[in-house]
Amino acid sequence: GPTAYCAQLDGSKAFAKDFMIKHHIPTAKYQTFSDAEQAIAYVKAEGAPIVIKADGLAAGKGVIVAMSEQEAIDAINDMLSGNKFGDAGSRVVIEQFLQGEEASFICMIDGNNILPMATSQDHKRIGEGDTGLNTGGMGAYSPAPVVTQQVHDKVIARVIQPVVDAMNANGTP
């Protein structure tokens, strides 16, 4: 398994985002907050749609794609003030909304070699037609049709390989 340092890439969205910025790995614009008032001010400045994420692991339910400012404010208050996700929600990452389809790209890495597994796309939303809140997972299909060979190669070159290189440079493969 991963080292404790590397496990933070999955266990803390704030850590992962900071890691990506530090190592010039493409990611959406973001800010991290533990204060609800500051987070709400940021949402008001950025506008909606916007994505609110509990920093820690929240059983697949810690991400709210807020289509309105009020929905974003409610999510911030639930996470930071309402303690909805316990310690996982003691910080939030507020991220730029990116239009498009999401796919999962999982690799096995031994510190140097990359073995890509089959890609997949989740059925995350509770309602028909990809509507409603995210769930912990309603199912998935694989391989993900949006991951063409060109997309696959681009993800390896611009995301996966730079992560491996950065972990090795940090002495934490």
State the predicted function of each range.
Residues 66-173:
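Internal nucleotide-binding/catalytic subdomain
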Residues 4-6, 16, 38-39, 71, ...:
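Catalytic-core regions of core metabolic enzymes
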Residues 1-11, 25-32:
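A short, GP-enriched loop/loop-strand-helix hinge that lies immediately N-terminal to
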Residues 31-35, 66:
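Short acidic-hydrophobic, aromatic-tinged amphipathic segments that line or gate anion-handling sites
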Residues 8-14, 127-129:
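Short, charged, surface-exposed secondary-structure boundary motifs
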Residues 47-69:
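Conserved anion/nucleotide-ligand pocket segment
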